[in-house]
UniProtKB/Swiss-Prot annotation:
NCBIfam families: small_GTP
General function of this protein: Intracellular vesicle trafficking and protein transport.
Phylogenetic classification of the source organism: Eukaryota, Viridiplantae, Streptophyta, Embryophyta, Tracheophyta
Gene designation: RABA1G
Subcellular location: Cell membrane
Originating species: Arabidopsis thaliana
Membrane topology reported for the UniProt record: Lipid-anchor
Name the UniProt record assigns to this protein: Ras-related protein RABA1g
Length: 217
């Protein structure tokens, strides 16, 4: 169960990045999850910003530091710093603009080029409330997610549909993979000091966790 907590009260800190084309709704997903706000006049993010929110996972407090940047090509120079240390990602496209879904493959390659193979990835089809304008089918997106071994959800930042679920699923999976990795090496990741970064293991570890609950829509 997710809950708002004081910023300094947490057991683990995970960096999660939002990626995808400009205008797909990344900033509104972030503000909906962290502040329960939505702006119809949202402008393109200039540079980088991040927000935080803590949730409960298995009686531990997991704090997400969620980074957001504009998708325009001219900001690609910040790529390395943006991705560094990320253990989770939400790869966002707009269900009403097919080109944003076509570009998901490029974003995914860039993400994997700059992060560890074990990163937990959620493919997110945003603006699902605009049913009459849909240009990307749920089936096509789900097939892509299964092929690329990522999680998948459709969301609406406007209606707050699945926004909570998408972020909490990513954070829960990061926690579970990290816990399994610690168990495999005979350590207990729940005893690590506050703020210590977590190596969430290999890509196989992520795949194994995915078998439990993948690709809900």
């Amino acid at each position: 169960m997710a809950a708002y907590r004081a910023d300094d009260d947490y057991d683990f800190l995970y960096k999660v990045v939002l990626i995808g084309d400009s205008g797909v709704g990344k900033s509104n997903l972030l503000s909906r999850f962290t502040r329960n706000e939505f702006s119809l006049e949202s402008k393109s993010t200039i540079g980088v910003e991040f927000a935080t929110r803590s949730i409960h996972v298995d009686e531990k407090i997991v704090k997400a530091q969620i980074w957001d940047t504009a998708g325009q090509e001219r900001y690609r120079a910040i790529t390395s710093a943006y991705y560094r240390g990320a253990v989770g990602a939400l790869l966002v496209y707009d269900v009403t603009r097919h080109v944003t879904f076509e570009n998901v493959e490029r974003w995914l390659k860039e993400l994997r080029d700059h992060t560890e193979a074990n990163i937990v990835i959620m493919l997110v089809g945003n603006k699902a409330d605009l049913r009459h304008l849909r240009a990307v089918s749920t089936e096509d997106a789900k097939a892509f997610a299964e092929r690329e071994n990522t999680f998948f959800m459709e969301t609406s930042a406007l209606e707050a549909l699945n926004v909570e679920n998408a972020f909490t699923e990513v954070l829960s999976q990061i926690y579970r993979v990290a816990s399994k990795k610690a168990l495999d090496i005979g350590d207990d990741h729940t005893t690590l000091p506050k703020g210590q970064s977590i190596n969430v293991g290999s890509k196989d570890d992520v795949s194994e966790v995915k078998k439990v609950g993948c690709c809900s829509s």
